[in-house]
A protein has these predicted regions:
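Short histidine-centered beta-strand/loop micro-motifs
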Residues: 15-16, 46-47, 56-58, 75-78
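A short, surface-exposed loop/turn module that caps and links secondary-structure elements
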Residues: 31-58
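Arg/Lys-rich, positively charged N-terminal/basic patches that mediate binding to nucleic acids
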Residues: 1-31
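Enriched for short, Lys/Arg-rich terminal
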Residues: 58-63, 67-102
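A generic structural signal for beta-strand entry/edge sites
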Residues: 1, 52-54, 80-82
């Protein structure tokens, strides 16, 4: 299984998102689907244009912004591979949030 870490922003976002009806689905995507190797076929993952390594995962009305851990980060954590979840945002806020990644 891959390691999935949450940034402080993602932890704050997730706390808010878990209070919504989509909360259980978001939690499943982060804890189970992203950690699975290989990812489930129904996991909707797309690269974010113009952002380099950042990816977007669709989870109901929410979008999860993440990137793969680089080799140094994996080595420091003692894992072969993993991901850093940076934000968990409502889809209507995604474009505003993405300005920081470009």
């Amino acid at each position: 299984m891959a390691r999935v870490d949450l940034s402080s922003s993602a932890q704050k976002d997730l706390g808010k998102a878990l209070k919504t009806p989509a909360g259980a689905g978001i939690k499943r995507v982060i804890l189970q689907d992203l950690a699975a190797e290989p990812w489930p076929e129904n996991l909707d993952v797309k690269p974010l244009e113009g952002t380099g390594r950042w990816l977007r995962v669709r989870a109901g009305e929410f979008r999860i912004v993440l990137r793969p851990l680089n080799a140094a980060e994996c080595k420091a954590r003692g894992v072969a591979n993993g991901y850093l979840v940076d934000r968990v945002v409502n889809r209507r806020d995604l474009e505003r949030i993405l300005k920081a990644y470009r």
